[in-house]
Amino acid sequence: MSNQAVSDITGKNKDILFHSVNINYDEFKSGRLAWDYEKFMDIVGLSMDEIRKIAAEVYVGSTPLIELNNINRLVRSISPKGKGARIFLKDEADNPTGSFKDRRALLPVYEAKKSGYPGVIASTSGNYGAAVASQAARRGLKAIICQEVYDDAGNGQPESLEKGRACESYGAEVQQYTVGPEVFTYVILKLLDDLGYFSASLY
């Protein structure tokens, strides 16, 4: 990619991001370095009951909460009387892709479908990509997952390569790149601009 191509895309950064999520982030600025999180959350417009219903549609959440009885007995046996917490484990592996990231992918993919986007794009090298791909498949959307996988010598990170295969198993197109800022400053913006997909990226 030429410097001019990068400049052309990054120069349209705000416009591309606005069209990829229908949010003008400037409305939420609070000073030079901060932004108004509470005001931002108001635009979600969903109650917790509605979010739970959306999650149930695609089998996200309601994961088991397991009390660790043996550990709790041990803690009580060595703690002063009346002390010693009860310890529970939340089994997020019971989510569709075996990760708590299914919860994070839930609403962006739902919003993309509700708003009529043809697909979603996310940049991630881990569990979030599989979660986005899985949710997109359930909602009938296309998905492109962009991964930073390779070092400068062309060696792929085994965990990221494996996550890429997981994304593909859910029907996503996986694009893999050498680690570097261009994935975020150019590749994602270019894809969003060219395809008109929803940006489900965390970054």
Regions found by a protein language model. Give the residues of each.
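PLP-dependent amino-acid enzyme catalytic core
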Residues: M1-Y203
